[in-house]
Swiss-Prot record:
Gene3D superfamilies: 6.10.250.590. Induction: Glucagon release is stimulated by hypoglycemia and inhibited by hyperglycemia, insulin, and somatostatin. GLP-1 and GLP-2 are induced in response to nutrient ingestion. Disulfide bonds: none annotated. Residues 84-89, 131-145 form a propeptide. Residues 1-20 form the signal peptide. The keyword Secreted applies. This is Pro-glucagon. Pfam families: Hormone_2. The modification Arginine amide is found at residue 127. It is found in: Secreted.
Length: 180
């Protein structure tokens, strides 16, 4: 993508340069025609025209210099911004985010570890088939229908819960050798 922009920029510069050159050639040709001998040349007018031309050339060159200088300053500013962003500001932000995330991560890890320990302890005790107390609530949710269309969402939730319960019961009731 950058190469396309680069080629387009070069093309624009070439076209602009050719237009400026053709305009300069046209101006030089109009100046190179000598005035007829019958018309007297006024030296004061000739000097004013030369003066305006030299001032215009200086102004044009100076504006080109200022444009290139602005471009250099902009590139330098971009480079400095990128350096500062990568070194100081970004490191500070990452450090803060890391500290906040570490606490959250530690709490989450602790809670996950506790849940895993409780589940393993429950499996080791071998309670056998577990009756879920929420079975009654699940049956009631089956029968209930809402006018706002949440029936299908609740139906999916109920079916997921039933499938999970059946899977856990299957895990508890089958032997390890049967699962292979």
């Amino acid at each position: 993508m950058k190469s396309i922009y680069f080629v387009a920029g070069l093309f624009v510069m070439l076209v602009q340069g050719s237009w400026q050159r053709s305009l300069q050639d046209t101006e030089e040709k109009s100046r190179s025609f000598s005035a007829p001998q019958t018309e007297p040349l006024n030296d004061l007018d000739q000097m004013n025209e030369d003066k305006r031309h030299s001032q215009g050339t200086f102004t044009s060159d100076y504006s080109k210099y200022l444009d290139s200088r602005r471009a250099q300053d902009f590139v330098q500013w971009l480079m400095n911004t990128k350096r500062n962003k990568n070194n100081i500001a970004k490191r500070h932000d990452e450090f803060e985010r890391h500290a906040e995330g570490t606490f959250t991560s530690d709490v989450s890890s602790y809670l996950e570890g506790q849940a895993a320990k409780e589940f393993i302890a429950w499996l080791v005790k071998g309670r056998g088939r577990r009756d879920f107390p929420e079975e009654v609530a699940i049956v009631e949710e089956f029968r209930r229908r809402h006018a706002d269309g949440s029936f299908s969402d609740e139906m999916n939730t109920v079916l997921d819960t039933l499938a999970t319960r059946d899977f856990i019961n299957w895990l508890l009731q089958t032997k390890i050798t049967d699962r292979k």
